[in-house]
């Protein structure tokens, strides 16, 4: 957070808009700067690597942990499919992980409800679980096309991520979308620090397989989709 504040302090007063061109990290930095300077933010993603392009939050690291800062959403998002389509295959559609984590998110959410570990605000809601499960099912269906850079599949991915973000915003929490796979991702990051952090999907993917296995799920379809 302190580094982001330093960047914000260095923004000249005559700047009227912040443009972010790149992946999820670039988007987060742009949103944070726009929020601190109270100016519009325009993001042009070069990959569909995560759902952060569409959220009102920024994931900022401080003291070895990740904190979420509510900055508000971007003012405008410009998607050029020719740019997305030609991105490196390993990150081009990596945002599909945001839909696959629904699998463990829902399993953890139901488990917590069965053991009276939810709050009034995060109580299990079958209607929401049903909708989110449908989004995850669609992710498995489009995965092959996303991996091949098929524009229609990438459009589907973008729409599904938007719906996922919209529903979690409506619920006011991420229980149906994120699960215990996140614990693995953050633990790995702490145990094996790197000068350049691993992409989000690369950290969460193994955790997703572990969490699903702990719930007794067949991880074959998930492994194939991640591949």
What are these regions (language model features)?
Residues 13-33, 37-46:
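A short, small-residue-rich loop immediately preceding and capping a beta-strand
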Residues 35-135:
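A glycine/threonine-rich phosphate-anchoring loop and its flanking beta-alpha core
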Residues 124-226:
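Active-site segments that bind and position negatively charged phosphate/pyrophosphate groups
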